[in-house]
Design a protein with these regions (language model features):
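Structural signal for interior beta-strand "rungs" in well-ordered beta-sheet cores
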Residues: 38, 96-307
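Terminal amphipathic alpha-helical/low-complexity segments used for targeting or macromolecular assembly
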Residues: 1-100, 161, 166, 172-173, ...
Length: 346
């Protein structure tokens, strides 16, 4: 693709050789004459100028003293992501049902759907047009998949769950397993039936081996545009808002509410019925206690989660703890000497 065409497609401007062909995206370290590179910040500018990439996508203020071929974009990361998708389109699956797949007679299969080997689709399921279902997937009864979804190999969607249009579910994820609910009867636990479901909005992406449990009653909800990384656990009756991002190995206990546009780091633990406000940021490894409220726009870290400034102050004090212990021991020694001297004078 020519640089001129790519810039026009991105709605950006270019400088340099507009007729230069770029055929793939590459890192700055490995890029060659026909590769497209990316400079996202001023810090990377020097590396970008030294790169052998045939073309660079850069921010508007990028210096270009060597008159390199560049594409200036107001949002360079977004522009580069779109360019990567254009230069490296996903392989199209041939529509149709593999001979080893099992599809219930009452299932509704949209046009252009591809169902891979050894997959199953249950009674009353509805599969939207142009959806791709990989090998070994299990789609339960009355499941609804929107248009243009992609289910990679070995995804399981339990009965009665809904997944919106253009959803991406990576290998091994499980949607709609029973929530962790039990009642103590005498000296033993009895299972609390989990009769709710899971509903996932449009344009969501669910990482590999992530599990989203069905509600005990009602709905476990994932809002549109939300992205969950690998190995995330969402407990029963959680309500995750729109355009929330969650990094790997994070766990949501039952009944947690996360409002729109929150950012949650990796290995975060969130207790029952906690509430995370819109645009809040939870740092990696922090712990939010049961029923705790993290207010809108707040940045928290540590366990128990607390405002970042407070956490950093406490961390700085903690690092000085060995020194402070020595100082305290010295103060005690000197105090004892003074007290001993006073007693002798008496």
């Amino acid at each position: 693709m020519r640089v001129r065409e790519l810039a026009e497609w991105l709605g950006a401007t270019f400088e340099g050789d507009g007729e230069r062909e770029v055929v793939r995206a590459a890192s700055l370290e490995s890029a060659g004459a026909t590769d497209l590179g990316f400079v996202g910040s001023r810090k990377a500018a020097e590396q970008g100028l030294a790169s052998a990439a045939g073309c660079l996508i850069v921010p508007p203020e990028f210096p270009n003293p060597a008159a390199r071929t560049i594409i200036r974009a107001c949002e360079p990361r977004t522009a580069f992501a779109r360019a990567v998708g254009r230069l490296h389109p996903a392989a199209a699956a041939e529509p149709g049902v593999h001979p080893t797949a099992v599809v219930a007679e009452s299932a509704e299969i949209g046009s252009g759907v591809a169902i891979g080997p050894h997959s199953s689709v249950g009674e009353g399921a509805r599969i939207g047009a142009r959806t791709r279902i990989g090998a070994g997937c299990a789609i339960g009864r009355r499941v609804r998949l929107g248009e243009e979804c992609t289910l990679h190999a070995n995804v399981t969607v339990y009965d009665d769950c809904d997944i919106g249009a253009r959803g991406i579910l990576h290998s091994g994820c499980v949607i709609g397993a029973d929530g962790f609910g039990f009642a103590m009867a005498g000296d033993r636990y009895e299972k609390f039936p989990q009769i709710g479901r899971v509903a996932i909005g449009d344009d969501c992406e669910i990482g590999a081996n992530t599990c989203i449990d069905r509600a005990a009653l009602g709905v476990t909800w994932i809002g549109e545009g939300t992205k969950l990384d690998n190995l995330v656990q969402v407990g029963h009756n959680c309500r995750i808002g729109r355009h929330v991002v969650v990094a790997a190995q994070t766990g949501f206990s039952g009944g947690v509410v996360v409002e729109d546009y929150a950012v949650i780091g990796g290995q975060v633990g969130i207790g029952d019925k906690a509430r995370i406000g819109t645009h809040a940021v939870l740092g990696s490894g922090c712990g939010v206690l049961t029923s705790k409220i993290v207010h809108a726009g707040q940045v928290v870290w540590g366990t128990p989660a607390r405002p970042l400034k407070e956490y950093l102050e406490q961390l700085a004090s903690l690092r000085r703890l060995p020194e402070m212990r020595q100082e305290l021991a010295e103060f005690r020694r000197r105090l004892e000497e003074l007290e001993s001297a006073d007693r002798r004078r008496e």
